[in-house]
Amino acid sequence: MDSSVTTGRSGIGTGQGSPAASGQPISKAGQAIPNLRDRIPKLEPRRRKQEPSNPTPVPETPALPPRPDPSTLVFQTPVRRILLLKDHELFLASPSFNLILSFVFSLSESVADTPISAIKDSDLSEPVKAILRILDETEALCKESPPDDQGGSRFGNKTFRLFLDKVKQRGHQWHAAFLGGKLPDAAVTEASAYLNQSFGNRTRIDYGSGHELNFIMWLLCLYQLSVLEQSDFKAVVLRVFARYLEVMRLIQMTYYLEPAGSHGVWGLDDYQFLPFLFGASQLLHHHFITPRAIHQELTLEEFGHDFLYLGQVAFVNSTKTVKGLRWHSPMLDDISSAKNWEKIEGGMRRMFVSEVLKKLPVMQHFLFGSLIPAAEGMSEQDPNALGSEENEEEGGEVEVYDDSDGKRHVHQPTGWGDCCGIKVPSSLAAAEEMRKRGQVESLRRIPFD
């Protein structure tokens, strides 16, 4: 038999001269399969430059400047100096801006990873104890001045003005008691002006982040006067500021203070800002309390007394007539999706600069004296043209003027400021009135826009 074997119809043999005999691969067409591996370009993923989630850098903490020598200062009653847009721009580029930033951020850094319970009574200095006594007496004045019966009205209660008058009358006495005559009366007058503006506006019967800032500026004045030291910073936040929050919550609920400059549901909080900055620092590296924990009622109940952030969220929840952060505080709800507290703390630093110090409607009420000086070139307030800050009508944005009806406005003459709008009662007042009538709702229907 012939050594070659045919395949019949294909006619392809396996003899000596065939491709199979030579070891070459066979295709159906009888040709060698080409190696395409080297011809096809290698697939590589595109390397896109990752943009930061927030292009605005986290503000750093400036170094605290040296404190002034009190003997070189000419003490004065603090007054408003941000009357025009250019005044605000001068302030943002001034040493006082850096002074405020360094003081607030230094306070925040001092309480990193520290619960309130870590500060014992034995750790408190005498000035800190004296400040706590002042806050205790302020609370007592509030309880001694019960609100008038307004027939169920949810607007600010006018007895609040009587309460503020009592605080102002006691202010000099309080300072003289704990300063012990170490400072001249003019210094006491300057420092006490900030405390007087820390509990709300007498005319508008409202309260906002600007009043909260005034309380911190009062503490800054005491630091500038060497009454408080850097070693007191931790106690200042965790004991003094925490106590201030307790007193303010009582005042807000007693007199139905309206939120000053509130963003409504789209704001962080109707009244406060700093509990979120200081509170995020407290939780910076916490092992098990994550940002999502603010949705857990048991966590808020168990740890709210120890961490300012959680305590403020718990208070906000208690004052809303609709349950769920998603509905009444969507910004807090959004922030809770952050990966860690470091992200939140950095965001709160940005927000303090952008939403407090860089907001003209907030800073137009800021007071400048010798301890927190105005920048050179800023406008000077005419004492004959404007009343005191506590009697100032609702603030606006740029320019102070009176219209044809004699109403004072603080914004562009062609614009529409907060002073022109209809007063809106606080949600806190709504919740309190519901409780008084025994109407406790677990859920309210929310209308569509």
UniProtKB/Swiss-Prot annotation:
It catalyses: [protein]-peptidylproline (omega=180) = [protein]-peptidylproline (omega=0). One of its GO terms (cellular component) is protein phosphatase type 2A complex. Residues 1-72, 378-416 are annotated as: Disordered. It is found in: Cytoplasm. Residues 389-403 have a biased composition (Acidic residues). Gene3D superfamilies: 1.20.120.1150. GO terms for molecular function: peptidyl-prolyl cis-trans isomerase activity; protein tyrosine phosphatase activator activity. This is Serine/threonine-protein phosphatase 2A activator 2. It comes from Neurospora crassa (strain ATCC 24698 / 74-OR23-1A / CBS 708.71 / DSM 1257 / FGSC 987).
